């Protein structure tokens, strides 16, 4: 029995070889990602050969270098983490996750560039707004944000992971520490919800919509929902 966990490539190859995917239903970009991952480090990508003077040969198949491929982006990810570690301070940091309601997913998919920009901008705005309040910090914080678009079950699930400094600099340049508690989750959740939906409704490219009334109804429904914001020390 093979206990090895399947990789994304294993899954893609399985559905391709068993005719379980209709590539014609994918966008051009999605088809490229799918095909690149299937070929990554396979013979069709070409190879480099190491040869020892003793006659031993070792073949290395080339990577696809697609930004969405988890295999050949691993080094870049580790390089990014190492680079950002040089900018960390000897302070407390908090891990904050912002998740969008699934009702908005169809509209995010219609215009991902706008949807993701809206998510980044309003998350940053919400965090900075609370940080400037003397009741919480009264200063300017640091934020590193990373977008995730998949859930653990491989479904479309856009959410933002943020590493937030446990404190900030006030107008006098003094450091205000926040070691035990960042912001009330409920307050942050409501503020984020309001900022996101306000921007989303006002600036969404309406030319992409077939039914504006339905869009407005979905936005109104999301106003009444509790939005998921999660925070803890990383």
Which residues make up each language-model segment?
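Beta->alpha loop/short-helix hinge microenvironment recognizer with preference
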Residues: 1-234
């Amino acid at each position: 029995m093979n206990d090895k966990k399947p990789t994304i490539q294993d899954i893609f190859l399985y559905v391709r070889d068993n005719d379980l995917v209709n590539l014609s239903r994918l966008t051009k970009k999605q088809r490229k990602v799918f095909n690149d991952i299937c070929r990554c480090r396979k013979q069709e990508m070409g190879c480099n050969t190491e040869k020892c003077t003793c006659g031993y040969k070792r073949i290395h198949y080339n990577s696809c270098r697609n930004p969405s491929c988890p295999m050949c982006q691993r080094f870049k990810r580790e390089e990014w983490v190492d680079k950002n570690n040089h900018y960390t301070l000897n302070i407390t940091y908090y891990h904050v996750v912002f998740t969008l309601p699934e009702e908005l997913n169809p509209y995010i998919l219609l215009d991902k560039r706008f949807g993701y920009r809206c998510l980044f901008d309003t998350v940053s705005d919400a965090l900075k707004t609370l940080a400037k309040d003397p009741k919480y910090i009264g200063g300017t914080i640091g934020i590193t944000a990373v977008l995730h678009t998949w859930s653990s079950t491989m479904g479309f699930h856009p959410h933002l992971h943020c590493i937030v400094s446990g404190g900030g600099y006030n107008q006098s340049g003094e450091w205000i520490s926040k070691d035990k508690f960042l912001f009330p989750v409920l307050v942050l959740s409501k503020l984020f919800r309001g900022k996101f939906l306000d921007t989303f409704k006002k600036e969404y490219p309406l030319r992409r919509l077939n039914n504006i009334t339905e869009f407005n109804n979905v936005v109104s429904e999301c106003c009444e929902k509790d939005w998921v914001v999660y925070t803890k020390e990383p």
